Amino acid sequence: MASPKHFLDLSAVGPQDLRTILDDARARKVATKAGTAEKPLAGKMLAMIFEKPSTRTRVSFDVGMRQLGGETLFLSGTEMQLGRAETIGDTAKVLSRYVDAIMIRTTDHSRLLELAEHATVPVINGLTDDTHPCQIMADIMTFEEHRGPVKGKTIAWTGDGNNVLHSFVEGSARFGYRMTMAVPMGSEPHDKFMNWARNNGGEIALYHDADKAVAGADCVVTDTWVSMNQEHKARGHNIFQPYQVNEALMAKAQKDALFMHCLPAHRGEEVTDAVIDGPQSVVFDEAENRLHAQKSVIAWCMGVI
């Protein structure tokens, strides 16, 4: 039996495959809006495991699988009790007998890896505490819709060194953009992601000054200062205040720079209303493109592209 095609991290999928997924996502978006989209996954079932609650991830994967012709099965963390009542390996083997693919959103990256190690069907990373690759696929798709090829462009991050940033860092090596980051002291991204990107051709630069990171950028990205279920890490929002994306900071970037945020946004904290509701903001295009990018991730994993 051939090994399943998992989508665990950008570092685990080659650049050609990532580009194939994005090309397919663009085509599926057009076909969906035209009412001509095919349904290649009729009769297929996607299990969705949510140890960490979500609106966008659940809805986008559910709707996406249905648009592909398949069905979904929602499993909450309390229902699954991964690694408690039963080993994760055994759960993976059992689910593989019932469904055709598994998406998991978890607070522990090791659970994702263990699930994929034992599953005989594709496993998709819907988000972990370490990475969020599906979000970056949607973000690159969105950037290229508005500004053309991302290769050679500069994407600037300001805020916390979190899971979304880790995937952006990996993406710099996979898609060829320059990644600049500004984070408070002590909130830096993990070295393993930085080192991997540098060793694989990524151009990355880390600052503790938002003005330096954003200067001349083609896109400015931020996220909530404290992620869900990580409130214990909060050391006072005052340390993040200099990293707020406001009109003054956006003025440091290119005049036509885009603003991105994976949502939900804490307005008045990491971003002001003037920016998120302004003409440079594409946050709702990002949210929509989660649907289309993830459809193509599912299709790639299941061998129909």
From Swiss-Prot:
Subcellular compartments: Cytoplasm
Range of residues in the leader sequence: none
Binding site for L-ornithine: 163, 223, 227-228
Alphabetical UniProt keywords: Amino-acid biosynthesis, Arginine biosynthesis, Cytoplasm, Transferase
Biological process, per Gene Ontology: arginine biosynthetic process via ornithine; citrulline biosynthetic process; L-arginine biosynthetic process
Enzyme Commission no: 2.1.3.3
Pathway: Amino-acid biosynthesis; L-arginine biosynthesis; L-arginine from L-ornithine and carbamoyl phosphate: step 1/3
Any one GO molecular function term: amino acid binding
EC class (word): transferase
One cellular-component annotation, GO: cytoplasm
Residues reported to bind carbamoyl phosphate: 54-57, 81, 105, 132-135, 262-263, 290
InterPro entries: Asp/Orn_carbamoyltranf_P-bd, Asp/Orn_carbamoylTrfase, Asp/Orn_carbamoylTrfase_sf, Asp_carbamoyltransf_Asp/Orn-bd, Orn/put_carbamltrans, OTCase_ArgI
Catalytic activity: carbamoyl phosphate + L-ornithine = L-citrulline + phosphate + H(+)
UniProt-listed Pfam families: OTCace, OTCace_N
NCBIfam families named among the record's database cross-references: orni_carb_tr, PRK00779.1
Family: Belongs to the aspartate/ornithine carbamoyltransferase superfamily. OTCase family.
PANTHER family: ORNITHINE CARBAMOYLTRANSFERASE, MITOCHONDRIAL, ORNITHINE TRANSCARBAMYLASE, MITOCHONDRIAL
Functional note: Reversibly catalyzes the transfer of the carbamoyl group from carbamoyl phosphate (CP) to the N(epsilon) atom of ornithine (ORN) to produce L-citrulline.
Protein name per the record: Ornithine carbamoyltransferase
Taxonomic lineage of the native organism: Bacteria, Pseudomonadati, Pseudomonadota, Alphaproteobacteria, Hyphomicrobiales
Gene field: argF
